[in-house]
């Protein structure tokens, strides 16, 4: 069974925890990871893009000139896609990009992502994260003691106002609760920082 050291906010060793093999030590399913990440990224899209077809552009109800006898090409509307100011052919319209993903697939993807980060030694477990102030400087000092200097995802079980304020000005830090952490977020970081409570949450939910 995999083991990991639990550190305090000063970066000192506190204890050792045995991680659940069914959550942090499975063989990552690459296809499931691909499918779920694609679905999660698709769900982020607004899908509000829109263009007007010839039916939606104002005007153009009158035939510009008669069909025959003028010597010019025949036209039925000045809003044809051939005309300047006309409609767009096969342009984008508002749509929902979200894709349904089954619960079992989502769970497997989450376990695969956690296992991948654990196997790559990119998992850091902290006993707890409590900040006395909301200052970014104090939070950054704590990160330096934990040797967290690259793009990281910090997962806690409960979001506090001080933690949210202290972390929001650091571009390389993403803060998320365990119940909302996505597979895409977990894979899209160099270091995954979990509190001990977050580890217990994942083991309980994904067992």
From Swiss-Prot:
Residues 57-78 are annotated as: Disordered. GO terms for biological process: translation. SUPFAM superfamilies: Ribosomal protein L4. InterPro entries: Ribosomal_uL4, Ribosomal_uL4-like, Ribosomal_uL4_dom_sf. Keywords: Ribonucleoprotein, Ribosomal protein, RNA-binding, rRNA-binding. Part of the 50S ribosomal subunit. One of the primary rRNA binding proteins, this protein initially binds near the 5'-end of the 23S rRNA. It is important during the early stages of 50S assembly. It makes multiple contacts with different domains of the 23S rRNA in the assembled 50S subunit and ribosome. Forms part of the polypeptide exit tunnel. This is Large ribosomal subunit protein uL4. It comes from Onion yellows phytoplasma (strain OY-M).
